Amino acid sequence: MFQKVKTIYFGFTLFFSLTVLSDSFDYNNYNNHGVVGLINMPTARFFDESSHGFTFNFSDPDQKITMTSSPFDWLEASFFYTNISNANYCADLEEPICRQDYKDKGFNAKIRLKEEGKLPALAIGLNDFGGTGLYSSEYIVASYGIDNLDLHFGLGWGNLNNSEDFKNPLIYLHDSFGTRPDFTESEGGQFQKDRYFSDSSITPFF
């Protein structure tokens, strides 16, 4: 199924690239997770109000389809469905359904806190906040443009916390922010509030 979708996607991309000017969206692009950003990194940029996107990311082992909408120019929301080819759907391999690839779904959201002016634009976001949390991450990110150069700097929790460079500053507000619950398959469809912005450390990205 994903192979067929991949073929359709490449055909659509070729057609789209021939009919839309390169600067139609002020250089904004969706990243691999269907969020406006660069590769795996989110930015504080947004598409215009009433913009909608449908993205595909085919990598190994993940294949992800994401539908993204911007009902307001300060809000971006998306729903994704993913197939993970190197994991089984469930543990009991004697059952045929368990031998298929693992499937997951979830939601992403990003909110603009400040528009760009003399100071950078500022946004806060959550990835995979309403699913199992397999891809869950939270972030605060700033973006600032200088002519054709767009600069971004952010702080990431969860899956964006790759190097564990700095202590999570929210621990100083409450000790509960210092522990992040592990991913569990049984919690799909639940909002796991005890995971948001929680971790012993954070990682800057730019």
What function would you assign to each model-found segment?
Residues E95-I97, P169-H174:
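Flexible, surface-exposed loop regions and adjacent strand-edge segments
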Residues A142, H152-G158, K167-Y172:
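Solvent-exposed helix/loop surface patches that form functional interfaces
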